[in-house]
């Protein structure tokens, strides 16, 4: 019996296949993609289904079976064409014209209950014309890591893709950076768009200004609809993209997230975070923390992320000059640092409990916070969680009580940075009445969940899968993340 026969659902219409798919990108024509065929897998086991996002598709999780997920996203029944998107990109600063969807494709596009258009994009679904000698597959660990990254960032308020499902495929893969053979998976990502900065860069490489304008009109029509009827819609689009990207990277920085591979082909034209490879959350505040072992010179280290995103936006100006005036784009990009700074300060203040402070207070508090974190090497996430865990309205009245009872307090008088921070935090609290201080306590709890996705945490969920095929620690971790536990 074949796998298709095993998962025969003739008497049960598959709600994932009968969704009202829209041929939005397909309608642009084959200058932007290649039609491909999905790989066939020896064994399909559903390992993850994201019921939390099914209602956004108008689906009741109770009516969607595990077999529905496998049939739609493991056997890929009922959907054609499957589109491998074409793009180029700057990788570690060097232009690479040999890129494109090498192990995935656009499965389809669906209008959500919120009226927004969403992509279903696969990862690990087999070879395409852009596989560049690779097998087109995704390791199981790679799938696990992307599920965790997307859910963690979403709960932290970062604008991110989500994983709709992850299916183990029964293949053994050989990888230089994992014990091999290693298990394999296919994953389906749901986000606004898989159109990348590199999509436009490829069209410029082939001197197709007509296709650049056509694609830009498509992007504005579907993802910047409010600009459609503006006379200067193209310049306004770029200015808004700058703002979205600046705020996104500020969200990463506040979350302590290091993307690791900020090539232009990994930058979404909607300003979303997606495509998670060797990412990491910083264990301590080390500005030069680098997540990818192959980033030898620290190009994509934690502190460089804003400047790299700004550089990527500058590189995007080159193809967009076919449509948008250079001066207009430069004016838009000039506001990047302002947007990034404002978003980062707002988010960091919230992590410290405050909705708003005077500019001098905010600057001094953030400066002292980062100075203490960097010089003490206290855990970045631990510091903020300990603030939330031990906070008391009594801190308002007595500076000696600030962070008392936490696991991070240095011996009295041994850390001037910590002492100065406590005095300032107490002083700021004195500007608030008791009811306002209670709101500060609520903010601390909300913005600093207990669970942090550090690498040891991921390994603790992964090792039982490797050793015993025990998925419960993984499910428990996802549940803890989603519940902000």
UniProtKB/Swiss-Prot annotation:
It is an enzyme of class 2 (transferase). ATP binds at residues 100, 102-103, 123, 135-136, 189, 196, 275. Signal peptide: none annotated. Its EC number is 2.7.7.-, 2.7.7.108. The active site is at 265 (proton acceptor). Belongs to the SELO family. Nucleotidyltransferase involved in the post-translational modification of proteins. It can catalyze the addition of adenosine monophosphate (AMP) or uridine monophosphate (UMP) to a protein, resulting in modifications known as AMPylation and UMPylation. Mg(2+) binds at residues 266, 275. Its cofactor is Mg(2+); Mn(2+). It catalyses: L-seryl-[protein] + ATP = 3-O-(5'-adenylyl)-L-seryl-[protein] + diphosphate; L-threonyl-[protein] + ATP = 3-O-(5'-adenylyl)-L-threonyl-[protein] + diphosphate; L-tyrosyl-[protein] + ATP = O-(5'-adenylyl)-L-tyrosyl-[protein] + diphosphate; L-histidyl-[protein] + UTP = N(tele)-(5'-uridylyl)-L-histidyl-[protein] + diphosphate. This is Protein nucleotidyltransferase YdiU. Keywords: ATP-binding, Magnesium, Manganese, Metal-binding, Nucleotide-binding, Nucleotidyltransferase, Transferase. HAMAP family: YdiU_SelO. GO terms for molecular function: AMPylase activity; ATP binding; magnesium ion binding.
């Amino acid at each position: 019996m074949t796998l298709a026969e095993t998962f025969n659902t003739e008497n049960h219409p598959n709600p994932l296949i009968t969704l009202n798919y829209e041929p939005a990108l397909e309608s642009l024509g084959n200058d932007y993609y290649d039609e491909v065929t999905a790989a066939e897998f020896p064994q399909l086991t559903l390992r993850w289904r994201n019921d939390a996002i099914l209602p956004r598709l108008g689906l009741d999780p109770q009516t969607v079976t595990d077999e529905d997920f496998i049939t739609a996203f493991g056997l890929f029944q009922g959907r054609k064409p499957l589109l491998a998107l074409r793009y180029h990109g700057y990788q570690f600063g060097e232009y690479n014209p040999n890129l494109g969807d090498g192990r995935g494709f656009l499965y389809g596009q669906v209008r959500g209950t919120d009226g927004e258009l969403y992509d279903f994009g696969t990862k690990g679904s087999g070879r395409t014309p852009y596989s560049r000698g690779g097998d087109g597959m995704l390791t199981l660990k790679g799938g696990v890591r992307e599920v965790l990254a997307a859910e963690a960032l979403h709960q932290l308020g970062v604008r991110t893709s989500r994983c709709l499902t992850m299916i183990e495929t029964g293949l053994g893969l050989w990888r230089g950076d994992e014990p091999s053979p290693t298990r394999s998976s296919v994953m389906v990502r749901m986000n606004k768009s898989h159109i990348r900065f590199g999509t436009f860069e490829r069209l410029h490489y082939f001197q197709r200004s007509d296709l650049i304008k056509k694609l830009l009109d498509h992007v504005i029509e579907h993802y910047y609809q409010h600009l459609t009827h503006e006379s200067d819609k193209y310049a306004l689009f770029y200015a808004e993209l700058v703002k979205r990207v600046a705020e996104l990277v500020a969200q990463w920085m506040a979350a302590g997230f290091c993307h690791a591979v900020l090539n232009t082909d990994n930058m979404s034209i909607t300003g979303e975070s997606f495509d998670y490879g060797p990412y990491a959350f910083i264990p301590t505040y080390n500005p030069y923390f680098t997540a990818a072992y192959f980033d030898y010179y620290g190009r994509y280290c934690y502190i460089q992320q804003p400047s790299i995103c700004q550089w990527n936006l500058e590189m995007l100006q080159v193809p967009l000059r076919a449509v948008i005036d250079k001066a207009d784009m430069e004016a838009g990009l000039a506001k990047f640092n302002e947007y990034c700074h404002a978003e980062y300060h707002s988010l960091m203040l919230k992590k410290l409990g405050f909705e708003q402070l005077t500019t001098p207070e905010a600057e001094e508090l953030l400066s002292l916070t980062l100075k203490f974190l960097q010089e003490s090497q206290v855990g970045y996430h631990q510091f903020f969680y300990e603030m939330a865990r031990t906070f008391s309205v009594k801190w308002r009245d007595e500076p000696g009580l600030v962070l008392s009872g936490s696991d991070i307090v240095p011996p009295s008088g041994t850390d001037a940075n910590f002492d100065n921070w406590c005095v300032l935090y107490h002083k700021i609290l004195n500007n608030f009445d008791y009811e306002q201080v209670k709101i500060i306590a609520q903010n601390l709890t909300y913005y600093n969940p207990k669970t942090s996705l550090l690498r040891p945490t991921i390994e603790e969920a992964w090792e039982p899968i490797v050793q015993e095929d025990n998925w419960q620690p993984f499910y428990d971790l996802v549940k803890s993340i989603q519940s902000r536990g």
